[in-house]
Amino acid sequence: PTRRSSDLALAKPSSFPVGQVDFLRILPLTFREMLVAEDEKNLIAYLDAKVDLDPIPDAFFNPLVENLKKYFLIGGMPEAMARWVNEKHSGQIDGILWSIIQAYERDFAKHPEPREYPKLMHIWHSLPSQLARENKKFLYQLVKQGARAREYEDALHWLVSAEVVTKVPRCTKPALPLSAYEDLSAFKVYAADVALLRRLAQLDISSFLHPTQLCTEFKGAFVENYILQALTVAFPVPLR
């Protein structure tokens, strides 16, 4: 059996076959890849050709918005996307996404230190509340009352190493290199996939398609997480 990079990050160093292993990073499918799967050739051509910030004509804006809403519902996880593309039926999407979340949580139990499992779950399930609030940074008190950074930093590191979540540190000034100006005490944490965030928040498809005032404000969290997801693909460097 193989070990996850997240396990290795918290385990003791061991031998490694240098030069004999190729690493392949696989991320959720992007919005553009969904348009390709849906054969939206006109929309793809427009996006590929657009290089300015001028307003988008309604002929493209409206279908792009509708497709983006669809992407928020389906996300980029391959099984969910394949089911939608092949069957055009949203009824089974939430079940697929929930199964992925349950698989993640079972994988959390394989953490080298069993005592870290509850902490992994607390951080994981705090994502919706972290992103729904007007927070400038990740708040440990939203993970668990009385939680402190030093108690949860190993668990958070595991989730980041496993690429289940993405951690984005704040920079103290916009200067290069950005890594030299990281504020280690201030960062935000995002889900790897926007639709997994929706299911983690227990928002079903009908609630999203027909929103009430109760869930309208949470759409900002979806947009923020989607932008992070898109930037992660566009820039093959740690985001800040």
Where are these regions (language model features)?
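Generic hydrophobic-segment detector
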Residues: 9, 65-66, 183, 210
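Conserved protein kinase catalytic core
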Residues: 9-10, 199
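Interdomain motor-coupling "hinge/lid" segment immediately C-terminal to the ATP-binding subdomain
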Residues: 4, 10-132
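Accessory nucleic acid-recognition modules appended to NTPase machines
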Residues: 82-240
